[in-house]
């Protein structure tokens, strides 16, 4: 009995000794694995996984209980109105939980059925416009994402829409996916009228009285009833957008070119099936709009969807090639990882060998559209050329890797949509070259007839191809060939889309059906939980932008960009002063960031050197600041220092006279002249909020303060007063007195110490242990998935998955 008691006490003391941050990371991995156990993806399985996590960890100790609350309440998946009502009552009873909610997901909400109708739901009043607004007011301190769907479109009145679009909150991701109808449209128009009170001016010259600098992601997918002038007003209010989904909306040519402001951070854009947009407007947008053409933009496009309906489109081959060339001209081809040009006609040459490649200023020139994409889009991982009839031989040439003489053009394509291709049919789908020509390809999307042919081959619904070591040889040696297995993905929830994927033991398993339908128990009768994820290739097949960060963020980079966390919390459990944290309350961004500034030259001065001070009375005074420089240049001082008789006893540090720095306090008056009054009003409001709530100064305010920048400009860039007195033998910046040994040691140091997150972009260079290749492969896959998460996100459950993967 004493032994049992001592063991219990030792385990409790051990649990208390572990820092909560470490426990948080461990439980985060468990929480992520359980919620990704989503094959097949049903609401019952989600609730079962959540219940398993709560029962396993909630009652261990106080630390586990607090961490479970942080993880569970962060992402609120509201599937029924009754669940929403229960959550609202819980928040009213415990206000500390309000700060833990970051995501409100209504995309799977439905309560119609089981004997209920929409009229009965209105009478129950579990979820109405009043209760929804009350929920938003309670969670405004830390709510980052609001994901709606068509099932709550009638509950989104003008007060809710005005509240969502108004500045002063940390809400960064807004998705109205599928919302339409007369009630929703009238509410949207009424809410926007409050931001555009002056109706006497032409609607295309109107400016909002307030702008929201916090919202970075906006989804209007399938909002078909919103008029074009309403879209104009919405886009004018959001100058800091990074992700914009306008798929299947009523946007027209004028709104596309004149209504979109100059977004410098845009990375994701979807203009799919916008029937009122002409090819000319799209080409003018990609040719002249500063969002695409400005070389000073912070980001370039990484995700682009311009697919159209082929039989009702006026696009031709010249338009498509012109669009691709404009993407290359403005540098987007170097960062694009997703490109959907389904329905756009492509020019197909008889053979790549008959279409010579010539290098020009911005791109490799050729006539064939596929060859142009192959040579000029090296980072592309997902490509859709749906509706184009391309021969199998041309597809094989396109997927075949480029020679090693051009390493910068190496292809990384993983997903290819060739549905609607008349050459890929039930007679040609079994061509083995289509499955073995590309080492990086993991999935193909084909038409139903082709997919059904593979499904009927055997009971396992798979096809096995062989990759030979000498594919060009007449005699094939199957004993040395590599076996490649491709399988049909069967899931009835995705409508009319059919995929073939290459199986592997980690990301795209071939035993999904057998494992998901099998329940196992141990010898004591406890259920064995086996994590079965959806295939990883589905994230490349999505046609809708994933706006948020998902159930559990896999990388801090995406969260930092989407949420604009300028001052992230030091800990989930302790604040910056060391006290117990009940939830992070970040400050919203209500003012634009300062312009980029300009280069200046600052002259070094040595306060401790009296000779230099005396000599300045005999020589011409050198101005403290020069005018802005067009490019960074340093002035040489070798000749002047040797010719100056007063500089005989000057220390080596004082010989460094000129320094170059980037002055962020220089304002672009022309850019800010129209916004000066508005910024001052927003700054006054922010000061009032800070005074009332006693908030601390944010890092953004501290680093972008012009007074701070001017004080910094008076500091010595190359030497401080302490270093001058203690170090008299500073090496020369020109390299005249530096030794080769120090240079070699510095180069060796740089070679051994990689920059932060280096292996996320170069996973193939990572080696965990030369004797353990399996663990090395797992690490490489992890780095690759985290890097892809920044652009593609992850395939979640619910209505988002339906809209993202539907036909």
Curated annotation (Swiss-Prot):
Pathway entry: Protein modification; protein ubiquitination
BP-aspect Gene Ontology terms: protein ubiquitination; SCF-dependent proteasomal ubiquitin-dependent protein catabolic process; ubiquitin-dependent protein catabolic process
Membrane-crossing segments per the record: none
Ranges of Basic and acidic residues composition bias in the record: 607-616
Keyword list, A-Z: Ubl conjugation pathway
Polar residues composition-biased segments: 627-644, 723-736
Official protein name in the record: F-box protein YLR352W
Species annotation: Saccharomyces cerevisiae (strain ATCC 204508 / S288c)
Source organism phylogeny: Eukaryota, Fungi, Dikarya, Ascomycota, Saccharomycotina
């Amino acid at each position: 009995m004493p032994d049992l008691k001592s063991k219990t006490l030792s385990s409790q003391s051990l649990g208390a000794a572990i820092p909560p941050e470490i426990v948080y990371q461990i439980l985060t991995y468990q929480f992520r694995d359980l919620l990704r156990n989503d094959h097949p993806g049903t609401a019952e399985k989600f609730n079962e996984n959540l219940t398993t996590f709560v029962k396993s960890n909630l009652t261990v100790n106080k630390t586990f209980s607090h961490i479970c609350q942080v993880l569970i309440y962060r992402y609120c998946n509201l599937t029924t109105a009754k669940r929403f009502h229960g959550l609202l009552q819980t928040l009213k009873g415990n206000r500390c939980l309000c700060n833990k909610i970051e995501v409100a997901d209504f995309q799977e909400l439905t309560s119609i059925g089981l004997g209920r109708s929409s009229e009965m739901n209105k009478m129950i009043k579990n979820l109405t416009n009043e209760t929804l607004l009350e929920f938003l007011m309670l969670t405004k301190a830390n709510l980052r994402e609001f994901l709606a769907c068509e099932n709550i479109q009638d509950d989104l009145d003008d007060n809710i829409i005005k509240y969502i679009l108004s500045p002063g909150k940390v809400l960064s991701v807004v998705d109205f996916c599928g919302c339409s109808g007369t009630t929703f449209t009238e509410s949207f128009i009424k809410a926007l009228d409050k931001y555009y009170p002056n109706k006497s001016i032409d609607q295309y010259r109107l400016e909002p009285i307030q702008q929201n600098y916090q919202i970075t992601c906006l989804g209007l997918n399938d909002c078909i009833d919103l008029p074009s002038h309403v879209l104009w007003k919405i886009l004018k209010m959001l100058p800091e957008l990074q992700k914009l989904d306008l798929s299947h909306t009523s946007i027209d040519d004028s709104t596309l070119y004149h209504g979109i402001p100059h977004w410098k951070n845009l990375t994701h854009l979807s203009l799919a099936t916008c029937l009122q947009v002409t090819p000319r407007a799209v080409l003018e947008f990609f040719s002249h709009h500063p969002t695409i053409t400005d070389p000073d933009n912070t980001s370039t496009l990484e995700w682009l969807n311009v697919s159209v309906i082929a039989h009702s489109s006026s696009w031709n081959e010249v338009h498509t090639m012109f669009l691709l060339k404009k993407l290359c001209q403005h540098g987007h081809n170097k960062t694009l990882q997703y490109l959907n040009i389904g329905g756009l006609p492509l020019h197909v040459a008889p053979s790549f060998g008959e279409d010579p490649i010539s290098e020009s200023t911005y791109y490799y020139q050729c006539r064939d559209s596929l060859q142009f994409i192959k040579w000029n889009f090296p980072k592309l991982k997902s490509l859709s050329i749906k509706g184009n009839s391309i021969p199998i031989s041309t597809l094989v040439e396109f997927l075949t890797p480029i020679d090693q003489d051009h390493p910068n053009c190496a292809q990384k394509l993983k997903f290819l949509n060739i549905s609607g291709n008349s050459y890929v049919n039930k007679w040609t789908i079994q061509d083995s070259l289509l499955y073995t020509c590309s080492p990086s390809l993991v999935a193909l999307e084909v038409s139903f007839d082709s997919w059904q042919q593979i499904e009927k081959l055997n009971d396992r619904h798979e096809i096995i191809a062989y990759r030979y070591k000498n594919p060009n040889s007449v005699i094939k040696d199957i004993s040395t060939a590599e076996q490649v297995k491709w399988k049909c993905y069967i899931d009835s929830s995705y409508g009319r889309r059919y995929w073939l994927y290459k199986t592997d033991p980690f990301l795209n398993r071939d035993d999904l059906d057998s494992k998901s339908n099998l329940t196992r128990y141990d010898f004591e009768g406890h259920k064995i939980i086996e994590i079965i994820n959806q295939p990883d290739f589905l994230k490349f097949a999505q046609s809708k932008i994933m706006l948020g960060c998902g159930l559990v963020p896999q990388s801090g980079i995406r969260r930092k960009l989407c949420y604009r966390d300028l001052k992230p919390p030091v800990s989930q459990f302790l604040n910056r002063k060391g006290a117990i944290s009940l939830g992070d309350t970040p400050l919203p961004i209500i003012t634009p960031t300062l312009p980029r500034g300009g280069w200046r030259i600052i002259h070094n001065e040595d306060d401790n050197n009296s000779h230099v001070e005396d000599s300045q009375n005999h020589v011409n005074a050198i101005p403290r600041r020069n005018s802005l420089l067009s490019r960074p240049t340093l002035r040489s001082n070798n000749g002047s220092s040797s010719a100056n008789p007063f500089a005989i006893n000057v220390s080596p540090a004082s010989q460094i006279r000129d320094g170059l720095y980037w002055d962020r306090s220089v304002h672009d008056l022309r850019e800010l002249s129209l916004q000066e009054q508005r910024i001052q009003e927003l700054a006054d409001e922010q000061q009032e909020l800070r005074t009332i709530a006693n908030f601390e100064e944010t890092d953004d305010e501290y680093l972008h303060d012009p007074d701070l920048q001017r004080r910094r400009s008076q500091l010595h860039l190359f030497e401080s007063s302490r270093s001058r007195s203690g170090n008299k033998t500073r090496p020369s910046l020109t390299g005249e007195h530096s030794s080769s040994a120090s240079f070699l040691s510095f180069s060796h140091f740089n070679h051994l110490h990689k920059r932060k997150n280096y292996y996320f972009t170069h996973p193939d260079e990572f080696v965990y242990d030369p004797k353990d290749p399996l663990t090395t492969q797992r690490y490489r896959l992890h780095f690759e998935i985290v890097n892809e998460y920044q652009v593609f996100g992850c395939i979640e459950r619910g209505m988002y998955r339906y809209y993202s993967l539907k036909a």
